């Protein structure tokens, strides 16, 4: 699946773009990122792509730590807020309605850095 790696490569480039201004010439040791279950990220591909991007962004030692966020929806029909098991179906597990609002699971956020 080369297209999955291309997707993760662009995500890693975006991460580096966020990190760069905050590093301000210091060594980046750790980058922490929240990834929602609905973002269709392949963790192994993201980690692999990070090893490539960090070399080109002058942060060769920077480790990528991922925190995965489960998907949760609130049903507009029955009002139930539920965790969903499948990233392919965001229907309400209680009443099967597709009229839902995603509460969690769309995150893709750099949450913190460690620099030295």
Task: Walk through the language-model features, giving the residues of each.
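Short cysteine-rich clusters marking metal-coordination/redox-active sites
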Residues: 75-78, 92-95
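Cys/His-enriched microdomains
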Residues: 73, 90, 108
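Immediate flanking context of iron-sulfur cluster ligation sites
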Residues: 65-73, 84-86
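Short loop/turn motifs enriched for small/polar and acidic residues
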Residues: 34-38, 67-71, 113
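Short Cys/His-rich "knuckle" micro-motifs
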Residues: 85-88, 102-106
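Long, charged N-terminal interaction/targeting segments
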Residues: 1-62
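Cys/His-rich microdomains that often coordinate metals
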Residues: 81-82, 99
